[in-house]
Design a protein with these regions (language model features):
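Interaction-mediating elements
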Residues: 1-129
Length: 129
């Protein structure tokens, strides 16, 4: 399971939202071996004055916060980050200094879905990749 939040200025996020979602999804499927039908992305459109970013970035600055079960290898997480930089830059007109990625991992028992705690749900994919 992974939940992905995307933050950016409304005027620069809205026009590329679908391309960003597609790029994110392709990265998660490849790096974490997610099933193609597992997509959970939320876009947070910020207004100027509510979103401050580093001086080294432009108004295109975009933050990706990924929350997922613990258990993925360091290599898989690094591959996900590298793929996100490559594909978001390519498909959504961002530069590397305009992208920030954070991954937060929590135990399965801290999740709840399909009516049960996450550690009691049988998944159709592997977490230990």
């Amino acid at each position: 399971m992974a939940q992905i939040k995307v933050y950016g200025l409304r005027e620069h996020l809205e026009p590329v939202k679908q391309r960003l979602s597609d790029a994110i999804h392709s990265c998660v499927v490849e790096a974490l071996r997610f099933p193609a039908d597992k997509r959970a992305h939320r876009f947070f459109h910020m207004e100027e004055g509510d979103f401050y970013f580093p001086a080294s970035a432009s108004e295109m600055y975009t933050i990706f916060e990924i929350s997922m079960f613990e258990g993925r290898s360091i290599d898989a997480k690094k591959q996900l980050i590298r793929l996100l930089f490559d594909r978001v830059c390519d498909q959504a007109d961002r530069k590397p200094n305009e992208i920030e990625v954070t991954i937060t991992e929590t135990p399965k028992h801290n999740w709840g879905f399909r009516g049960s705690p996450g550690d009691e749900v049988s998944l159709a994919y592997k977490v230990d990749v």
